[in-house]
């Protein structure tokens, strides 16, 4: 009896240690509050035990200082950070920048000593005031002239966090989001240098294909497809991860991005296989209302009456219905990605975004909130 109890306790301990060994970084987007009806998502919908880190997107920069973006950001900050009352181990970060912020604004701030210093000095008190545990830098697609300025910004921001913590507070975390395209990485990021000063790097391995290609294709393949052209050999998570590691990113700081959204296309002919021509992005979703993008919960609705397929080589699914072609991730594909990153001994997984998963658990017929994120968590925990 005693041996059985001891063995059970050991198994539980191993599972807990396994789960604790991997980060599950989850982004929440503040604009999801504006979606209609059941698509509207606020931070109190988040399970505080689901992710190890939740990143609030995005903060703004005004007069070279970090600032709110939405009119009710302060209220939402408080709602998010209240989750830590239920799970004190949860870490929250505030992401600054993003696609709409643009690279040029970052460039102007980071390229001048005084403006860079003003920005850096503004960050710790802002994070402390609003209850965050760290900052996520989402300077996306910096130009080649920006590479050294980004490195300096990261280095000086980390130094400020170290200095600020000397007062006895827990040191603030510093992370960065990095696009996964080889050209973007080469142009704007000194990976070996910035890795030294970051707690983790979120690799955005989910934007490899889009309507700009004028053909169908998957935006988040795990591996290269057998029919991929040589020009597409870099456009998969496996290559991006391997390339980042070769450039000097430590595996224990690299987090692989997994999307909870799909990309949709409008077919230009009856062809639906790889390379089929398109006339443009797919029709907007009922809630997200953006051409070419669908939340997972919208995809669950689309799948009713659709024909589903799977790229066996790329290990990701797609579906067709009428003239609509949708690439997406499901529980099988996200589990495969989680197993992959474990095999590569990476730091963990990143999810973009919680509000694009079936966060209510009412759309996908499983009676489970956050089915994709939970599937990732289960694999990371060894379940």
Swiss-Prot record:
Keywords: Antimicrobial, Apoptosis, Cytoplasm, Disulfide bond, Endoplasmic reticulum, Glycoprotein, Inflammatory response, Lectin, Secreted, Signal. Belongs to the glycosyl hydrolase 18 family. It is found in: Secreted, Extracellular space; Cytoplasm; Cytoplasm, Perinuclear region; Endoplasmic reticulum. The gene is CHI3L1. This is Chitinase-3-like protein 1. The lineage of its organism: Eukaryota, Metazoa, Chordata, Craniata, Vertebrata. GO terms for molecular function: carbohydrate binding; chitin binding. It comes from the Eukaryota. PROSITE patterns: GH18_2. InterPro entries: Chitinase_II/V-like_cat (IPR011583), Chitinase_insertion_sf (IPR029070), Glyco_hydro18_cat (IPR001223), Glycoside_hydrolase_SF (IPR017853), Glycosyl_Hydrlase_18 (IPR050314). One of its GO terms (cellular component) is extracellular space. Chitin binds at residues 70-71, 97-100, 141, 204-207, 263, 352. Monomer.
């Amino acid at each position: 009896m005693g041996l059985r109890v001891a063995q059970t306790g050991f198994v539980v301990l191993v599972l807990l240690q396994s789960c604790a060994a991997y980060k599950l970084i989850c982004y929440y987007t503040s604009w999801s509050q504006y979606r209609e009806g059941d698509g509207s998502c606020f931070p109190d919908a988040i399970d505080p035990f689901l992710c190890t880190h939740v990143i609030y997107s995005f903060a703004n920069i005004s007069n070279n200082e970090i600032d709110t973006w939405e009119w009710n950001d302060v209220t939402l900050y408080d709602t998010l950070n209240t989750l830590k009352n239920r799970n004190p181990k949860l870490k929250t970060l505030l992401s600054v920048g993003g696609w709409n912020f643009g690279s040029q604004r970052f460039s102007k701030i980071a390229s001048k000593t005084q403006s860079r210093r003003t920005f850096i000095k503004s960050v710790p008190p802002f994070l402390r005031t609003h209850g965050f545990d760290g900052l996520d830098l989402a300077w996306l697609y910096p130009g080649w002239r920006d590479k050294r300025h980004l490195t300096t910004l990261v280095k000086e921001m980390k130094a400020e966090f170290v200095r600020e913590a000397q007062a006895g507070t827990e040191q603030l975390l510093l992370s960065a989001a990095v696009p996964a395209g080889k050209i973007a990485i080469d142009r704007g990021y000194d990976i070996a240098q910035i890795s030294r000063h970051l707690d983790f790097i979120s690799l955005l391995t989910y934007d490899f294909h889009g309507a700009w290609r004028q053909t169908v294709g998957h935006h988040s393949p795990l591996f290269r497809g057998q029919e991929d052209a040589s020009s597409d050999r870099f456009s998969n998570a496996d290559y991006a991860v391997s390339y980042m590691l070769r450039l000097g990113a430590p595996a224990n700081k690299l987090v692989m991005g997994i999307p909870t959204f799909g990309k949709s296309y409008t077919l230009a002919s009856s062809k639906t296989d790889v390379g089929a021509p398109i006339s443009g992005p797919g029709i907007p979703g009922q809630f997200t209302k953006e051409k070419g993008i669908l939340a997972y919960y919208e995809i669950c609705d689309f799948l009713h009456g659709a024909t589903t397929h799977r790229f066996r080589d790329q290990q990701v699914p797609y579906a067709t219905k009428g003239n609509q072609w949708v690439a997406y991730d499901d529980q099988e594909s996200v589990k495969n990605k989680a197993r992959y990153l474990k095999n590569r001994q990476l730091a963990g997984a990143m999810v973009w975004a919680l509000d694009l998963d079936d966060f209510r658990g009412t759309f996908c017929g499983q009676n489970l909130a956050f089915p994709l994120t939970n599937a990732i968590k289960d694999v990371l925990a060894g379940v």
